[in-house]
C-alpha cells in the first residue's frame, strides 16, 4: 500500500516599514531555496506542523492566518523502490518574534519582497504558493468561527437543553481546539449562551486569562428571528480588530457564512450536497479586510477546517 507523505509549511511574512517581505530558506542538503516546511510529526495537525517547522527552520514564532494552497509531487520511497506521493499544505503566517540561526537543515535565510522572492525560489510549486499569498493583502483581520464540540444526543438529556454539557468526545475536541486555535493568536472569546458552546472555547480564553463573553445573537434562538442582525453583529466583531474566537451552533453557522460570502462575493468551498459545512468541533477561518471610515469589514477569504484533530487539509475558498 502506498503511504502518502504529509507535510506543512508557510509563507512567513513581516513588514519592513510599509514593505511586505517573505522568508526563504536555503537547504544545503538539496541545494535549493524554498519556503519553510517539513513533515508532520505523529498525531500532529497541519496547522501545528506549519508553526513548528517555521520555528525550527527560521527561528521565528509565527501566527497563522489564511490557508493558501496544497502542493503535491512524488518523492523517493523509503524502501528505495519507486516513489510515493508527498503533499504540503501552506498557510500565511506572520513573524512576531525570533531570530535566525543557521542549523543542519537550513544554513541561510533571506527576507525578500515577493517579486524578488519569486525569482529566487527553486521549485515551481513554491512559486505557485507565493502567488496565492500575494492575491490578498497582509494585515487582515481573522475571525475564528467555531461550531461547538460534541454534546451527546438531545433526546438523551432530560435537563434544560441550554445546560447540556460536552460529552467525552466533545471534551477531546475542545482540547484539540484549544491547541490549534492558539496558533492563530486569538485575543478574545465570544460564545452563544449555551453551556456546550462556552465549554468548547473556555480553554482558549483561559490561556490568556480572559472570560468567555455571551453573544445571544449567535445562538439559534437569537439568530433566526432576524439573521440580518446576526450578520451585522459578526461584522461588528470583525470591525473591532484583533483575532476573535466566536463559538456558535450548527443551525447558525452555515447561514451566517453563506450570507457573508454572498454579500462580499467570496466563493465557498464545495461540500456534499452543496451545503456549507459545519461539523461539530469544526471551525472557519474568516479573513476580513479591516473597516474604513466609509465601509464595514469585507470578507476576502473563508477556509473550513473540519476538525482540530489530525485531519485532511482545509477547504479553501
Which stretches of residues belong to each language-model region?
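Generic beta-sheet signal
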Residues: 142-144, 240-251
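N-terminal strand-loop-strand
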Residues: 1-35, 143-148
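Acidic, low-complexity terminal tails and accessory targeting/binding regions
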Residues: 172, 176-188, 210, 220-242, ...
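Active-site-proximal alpha-helix that buttresses catalytic centers in soluble enzyme cores
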Residues: 38, 139-225, 254, 263-264, ...
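A short coil-to-beta-strand element that immediately follows conserved catalytic motifs
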Residues: 61-70, 210-216
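Unchanged
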Residues: 40-63, 71-125
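Conserved Nudix-box catalytic region and its N-terminal flanking loop in Nudix hydrolases
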Residues: 18-61, 157-164
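Nudix hydrolase/Nudix homology domain
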Residues: 31-32, 98-153, 162
